[in-house]
């Protein structure tokens, strides 16, 4: 899906949400026609988004690891749902939970541009990637490429598949100050062999904030017939 269409769909999804989400819906609606590159530098847009968060003012949090802190309207709605589930007890689990899950899947599918049957809703990114890593059809001697700067939980999961299936983990180190994108792409290219099955790569490295050239890495890997897990 094109990023511009994604933003438009996100606007429609936000508008359909309760009144408390009005601030975010308005921010997206006012800027939905702008390209991602223009929107990235639109301070007015990001100020509207920033106003939806209540964060500790003592420091600026630049790390995007651990868990995703929520905009205030979403946090309030999340707590409201938890209270309702706790209030209903087993009745909720045996009745309305499936309707709620199906409705959520349908809305996410509309946003992602796929069918609800293609979606699996997990608790977080770590669980999703763990399932994807562990669910590969691994054979002894298969190779996986990753960087030492990748998220720790993912590296731990690759240790498990190494111990369980005999997978060979090839770990590279991404330079903090590369000359250009090609230097990073070459690191992954040189690690590929006929036995390489998958490359794990972080779009943004959580410990440094460094953004990697994902499109270039993916294009290179696909030319070699290698899957990429971002």
Named regions from a protein language model:
Residues 7-230:
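Pyridoxal 5′-phosphate
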Residues 1-2:
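N-terminal secretory signal peptides
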């Amino acid at each position: 899906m094109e990023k511009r269409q994604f933003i438009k769909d996100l606007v429609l999804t936000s508008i359909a949400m309760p009144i408390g989400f009005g601030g975010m819906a308005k921010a997206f609606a006012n800027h939905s026609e702008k390209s991602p590159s223009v929107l990235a530098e639109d301070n007015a847009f990001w100020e509207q988004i920033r106003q939806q968060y209540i964060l500790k003012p003592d420091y600026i949090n630049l790390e995007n690891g651990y868990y995703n802190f929520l905009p205030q309207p979403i946090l309030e709605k999340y707590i409201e749902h938890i209270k309702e589930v706790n209030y209903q007890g087993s009745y909720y689990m045996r009745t309305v939970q499936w309707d709620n899950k199906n409705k959520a899947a349908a809305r996410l599918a509309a946003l992602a541009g796929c069918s609800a049957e293609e979606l699996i809703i997990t608790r977080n990114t770590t669980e999703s990637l763990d399932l994807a890593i562990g669910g590969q059809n691994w054979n002894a001697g298969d190779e996986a490429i990753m960087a030492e700067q990748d998220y720790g939980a993912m590296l731990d999961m690759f240790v498990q598949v190494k111990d369980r299936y005999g997978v060979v983990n090839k770990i590279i180190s991404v330079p903090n100050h590369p000359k250009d994108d090609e230097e990073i792409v070459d690191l992954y290219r040189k690690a590929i062999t006929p036995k390489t099955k998958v490359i794990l790569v972080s779009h943004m490295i959580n410990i440094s904030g460094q953004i990697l050239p994902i499109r270039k890495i993916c294009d290179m890997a696909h030319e070699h017939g290698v899957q990429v897990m971002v």
